[in-house]
Amino acid sequence: MRLLSLAGAMALPLCVLAHPTHRTRGIARRGIDLTPYRLPGNAEYTSSRTSAMRSLLFERADGEDYVETAKKVLQSVHPDATFRVIDDHYVGDNGVAHVHLLQTAHGIDIDNANFNVNIDKNGKVLSYGNSFFSGKIPDSDPLTKRSFSDPVEALKAAATGLGIPLTADDVTSEGLDGTTSYTFKGTKGALSDPTADLVYLAKPDNTLALTWRVETDMNSNWLLTYVDAETAETIHGVVDYISDATYQVYPWGLNDPTEGSRQILEDPWDSKASEFTWIGDGKAKYKTTRGNNGIAQSNPDGGDDYLNNHRPESSSLKFVYPYSPNATSPSSYIDASITQLFYTANTYHDLLYTLGFNEKAGNFEANNNGAGGKGNDFVILNAQDGSGTNNAMFGSPPDGRPGRMYMFIWTESNPPRDGSMEAGIVIHEYTHGLSSRLTGGPANARCVDGEESGGMGEGWGDFMATAVRLKSGDTRQTDYTMGAWAANDPKGIRDYPYSTSMTKNPLTYAHLNNVTEVHEGGTIWASMLYEVMWNLIDKHGKNDAPKPDLKDGVPTDGKYLSMKLVMDGMALQPCNPSFIQARDAILDADVALTKSGNQCEIWKGFAKRGLGERAALKNGIRVDSFDVPKGVC
């Protein structure tokens, strides 16, 4: 399972080839290896508890727009910077306003220079994130000098340098916005016409590179490649948007066929979250697995023409199809697979909506029905996708463009198993879309791409999938694995089970020093969140219903409260956060949601796994701390 990975640890000449993909058992990276191009995270997060925030006296003046307050905060930190407000600001269901701003130079975006401000319901600044460029801005205006290469050369450089299977021999470019934005015509191999935008990119040596940001959607890799605009001979970094009626289904809470039997459910949608039901979009009603939140179909050849692919149809809206885990050919139960995938994705959509991932926060819906955000971005749900095996992927572009989920067949058992039948895999993949839309704002899908944030992207998926599958008799002594059924391995596809036992799972913050790929870092992060969740369950109890009970917008139990705080933390944290910054954002989420009612439980959970008060990154080495701040508990 993977989401976009931001690449570019250093600018690499085009003759340097990527290293072979490092694969772990089960859900791993695939396609083009972008590891050499990963950009290091450089964000700062000023939380509500820091002295810098306490000294920040800004409050929203009477009648003042919260966007203006955010501008004042930015200008107090970077008085000489030029910037623009990204048009994706919103007020979350916890009352916190989120404003995202992007630095500019000579009117050109600095694509990885972000600033986000969080303002509470009383108009006070709760926290802010900052990755603005602090070096010297070039004196000359490149738009005046026109000191940049032809964008066609940048497209060809991206294809050659990364080994993108794109034919661009007869390509032409069409200007969209003067001299800074282009669409390419005449290419072959991409799902849509590639584009190029002139942007700056802040480099690790604190200088700016003028680049063409070339977007190429190659199905299993959906790339933004930053090609030097002066020479067209250097790739400075890469982002990949792909991350590794009645329905007969395994109902919500059953992770896979080993946990129970399929049931026939009638009209299982939440009418508040899905006002058009799951099989309508406000314009039409469908008699198939198509609706406002997602369109599910088979995709055996791994292609992109999903609308014309097979999906089950029922004039009576009875999506009831046979399934046996022992069937020798997964294609024999494709209708059951599509129905299960459609059910799981829609149920998760409705749950996330209840917890705050709605239209204005950037959720995935075709028709937002005037509720904010951008529409036309349902999730394309491909069952038994033929573009891979033993894996799953999710592509999450910015708000207003459809997400894509690829569910594969797993061949580590005889007969093979269908990943759509393991709810945890579907939830993990969908959570990539959640974290991508909330972190950095709905309009910026480049903020879960750093060394640590990429790992947390995997960890959030594992955590949410594990929280959903908790059973009524579970306690903090209950352990869970990830992907065990699909992989035909009781140990699952992670190095350790999710457990509160340090014997069964010894992972701490310092283990990040030895991590070689994002799923290993994700296991560490999810292990921390698992500790926090059980601390909150011990305090507030556990609601085993498929949806939370809310009081003034706050879940009344510990399981759903932990999920809500994790989601609210995503919206608060800076673009490409570190573990420490993401921890602080969750603590700030509790400040905003419960008036600091759970600081002790949250701190104890993180501190148990080494992310306590004095945890630090020193000279490239992560140092554990098991301390809880004095006076918190």
Curated annotation (Swiss-Prot):
<feature type="binding site">
    <location>
        <position position="432"/>
    </location>
    <ligand>
        <name>Zn(2+)</name>
    </ligand>
</feature>
<keyword id="KW-0378">Hydrolase</keyword>
<keyword id="KW-0732">Signal</keyword>
<comment type="function">
    <text>Secreted metalloproteinase that allows assimilation of proteinaceous substrates.</text>
</comment>
<dbReference type="InterPro" id="IPR011096">
    <property type="entry name" value="FTP_domain"/>
</dbReference>
<keyword id="KW-0964">Secreted</keyword>
<dbReference type="GO" id="GO:0008270">
    <property type="term" value="F:zinc ion binding"/>
</dbReference>
<keyword id="KW-0865">Zymogen</keyword>
<dbReference type="InterPro" id="IPR050371">
    <property type="entry name" value="Fungal_virulence_M36"/>
</dbReference>
<keyword id="KW-0862">Zinc</keyword>
<feature type="glycosylation site" description="N-linked (GlcNAc...) asparagine">
    <location>
        <position position="514"/>
    </location>
</feature>
<feature type="propeptide">
    <location>
        <begin position="19"/>
        <end position="244"/>
    </location>
</feature>
<keyword id="KW-0482">Metalloprotease</keyword>
<dbReference type="GO" id="GO:0004222">
    <property type="term" value="F:metalloendopeptidase activity"/>
</dbReference>
<feature type="glycosylation site" description="N-linked (GlcNAc...) asparagine">
    <location>
        <position position="326"/>
    </location>
</feature>
<keyword id="KW-0479">Metal-binding</keyword>
<dbReference type="GO" id="GO:0006508">
    <property type="term" value="P:proteolysis"/>
</dbReference>
<feature type="active site">
    <location>
        <position position="429"/>
    </location>
</feature>
<keyword id="KW-0645">Protease</keyword>
<comment type="similarity">
    <text>Belongs to the peptidase M36 family.</text>
</comment>
<dbReference type="InterPro" id="IPR001842">
    <property type="entry name" value="Peptidase_M36"/>
</dbReference>
<feature type="signal peptide">
    <location>
        <begin position="1"/>
        <end position="18"/>
    </location>
</feature>
<protein>
    <recommendedName>
        <fullName>Extracellular metalloproteinase mep</fullName>
        <ecNumber>3.4.24.-</ecNumber>
    </recommendedName>
</protein>
<dbReference type="Pfam" id="PF07504">
    <property type="entry name" value="FTP"/>
</dbReference>
<dbReference type="Pfam" id="PF02128">
    <property type="entry name" value="Peptidase_M36"/>
</dbReference>
<dbReference type="InterPro" id="IPR027268">
    <property type="entry name" value="Peptidase_M4/M1_CTD_sf"/>
</dbReference>
<keyword id="KW-0325">Glycoprotein</keyword>
<dbReference type="GO" id="GO:0005576">
    <property type="term" value="C:extracellular region"/>
</dbReference>
<feature type="binding site">
    <location>
        <position position="428"/>
    </location>
    <ligand>
        <name>Zn(2+)</name>
    </ligand>
</feature>
